[in-house]
């Protein structure tokens, strides 16, 4: 969560956040004393985990400075979508592995076997599905999350839990994922179409400021959804589907549980808004190129938008202006065609 900078004079927001988290974890009536906390941090008796640093505000990132001699934390774990420099301190970096194309079938087979579902498929059906997934991602390495989502859809289709065929592109896979979450809800539920519309709206609310998956103001999100039932619909996505989660000291922010889902849903929002209007797309590309930390910080979103464009615009091709520019910008080579 973001740091709360409205603390008493002389207090450090980072330390105060740690104190608050410890009080919550230990269920104590009073927060731990500053002296004891500082000693525990110094002796590495507390491991501090800063999750999703790359998606936090610049103010919060600036407050986490392990290179400074007075930085209070001696055991720090940071998760980020970027290779954080952290002031040049000595660090150990671990990265999640992606699945190379020649390993896809073995990974998929292992996952389905672990779920006890491999016997649902003949060898022909299984390898056909692997080929289809490889076509969907093209020349990119495949993430574990994407493979899992696709395998789960394979199982759902085979067991009759869905009436649709397997998706043939990643944006459709994300919408299928929403449908499966919705199907698991008992009792009264939102229609799939309403769910898609609301999730796409919330995803854009979370990405529109920085083009990175981040937390959005809860009240602003409710206003974006619109209608008398907006708050209850937001709670449905949070409490029934676990698609979003509430964050912040005052529970005033919401964010998506899975970043790639947020990126693809926000990409669908852009395609719906801009369609084939090149002037709007040029403005978007210019704004994307000027984003702090671009292109690495927003590469996932740019490629998601490209996939959404190719999937949703009739007759769209890789060589068209928009997908070509999105790919080039996402790969860090800037815009090929200057905007007027």
Predicted regions and their residues:
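Sensor-1/coupling segment of RecA-like P-loop NTPase cores
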Residues: 55, 68-93
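Extended hydrophobic
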Residues: 1-3, 71-74, 85-88, 98-107, ...
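A short acidic-Thr-Gly-centered motif at the start of a beta-strand
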Residues: 38-41, 66, 242-249
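Extended amphipathic alpha-helical scaffold segments
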Residues: 250, 269-340
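Conserved P-loop NTPase "ATPase switch" module shared by AAA+ and STAND
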Residues: 39-60
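Post-nucleotide-binding-loop coupling segment downstream of the phosphate-binding loop, primarily
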Residues: 1-39, 43
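Short acidic, S/G/P-rich loop/turn micro-motifs used as interaction or catalytic elements
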Residues: 3-8, 53-57, 85
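Short amphipathic alpha-helical segments and helix-helix/interface helices
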Residues: 38, 61-69, 234
């Amino acid at each position: 969560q973001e740091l709360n900078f409205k603390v008493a004079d002389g207090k450090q927001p980072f330390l105060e956040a740690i104190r608050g988290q410890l009080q919550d974890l230990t269920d104590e009536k009073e927060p731990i004393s500053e002296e004891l906390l500082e000693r525990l941090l110094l002796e590495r008796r507390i491991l501090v985990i800063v999750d999703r640093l790359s998606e936090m505000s610049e103010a919060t990132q600036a407050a986490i400075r392990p290179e400074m001699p007075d930085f209070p934390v001696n055991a720090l774990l940071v998760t980020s979508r970027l290779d954080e420099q952290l002031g040049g301190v000595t660090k150990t970096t671990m990265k999640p592995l992606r699945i190379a194309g020649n390993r896809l079938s073995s990974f998929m087979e292992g996952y389905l076997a672990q779920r006890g579902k491999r016997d649902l498929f003949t060898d022909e059906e299984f390898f056909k599905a692997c080929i289809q997934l490889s076509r969907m991602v093209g020349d990119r390495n495949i993430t574990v999350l994407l493979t899992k989502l696709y395998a789960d859809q394979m199982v759902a289709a085979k067991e009759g839990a869905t009436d649709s065929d397997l998706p043939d592109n990643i944006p459709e896979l994300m919408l299928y994922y929403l449908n499966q979450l919705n199907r698991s809800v008992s009792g009264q539920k939102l229609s799939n179409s309403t769910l898609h519309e609301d999730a796409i709206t919330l995803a854009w609310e979370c990405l529109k400021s920085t083009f990175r998956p981040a937390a959005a103001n809860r009240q602003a999100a409710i206003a974006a959804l619109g209608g008398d039932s907006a708050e209850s619909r937001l709670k449905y996505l949070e409490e029934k589907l676990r698609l979003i989660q509430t964050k912040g000291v005052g529970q005033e922010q919401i964010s998506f549980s899975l970043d790639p889902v947020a990126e693809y849903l926000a990409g669908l929002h852009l395609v719906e808004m801009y369609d084939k209007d090149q002037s709007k797309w040029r403005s978007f590309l210019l704004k994307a190129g000027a984003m702090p930390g671009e292109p690495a910080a927003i590469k996932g979103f740019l490629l998601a938008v490209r996939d959404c464009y190719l999937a949703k615009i009739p007759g769209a091709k890789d060589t068209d202006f928009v997908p070509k520019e999105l790919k080039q910008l996402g790969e860090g080579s800037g815009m090929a065609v200057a905007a007027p």
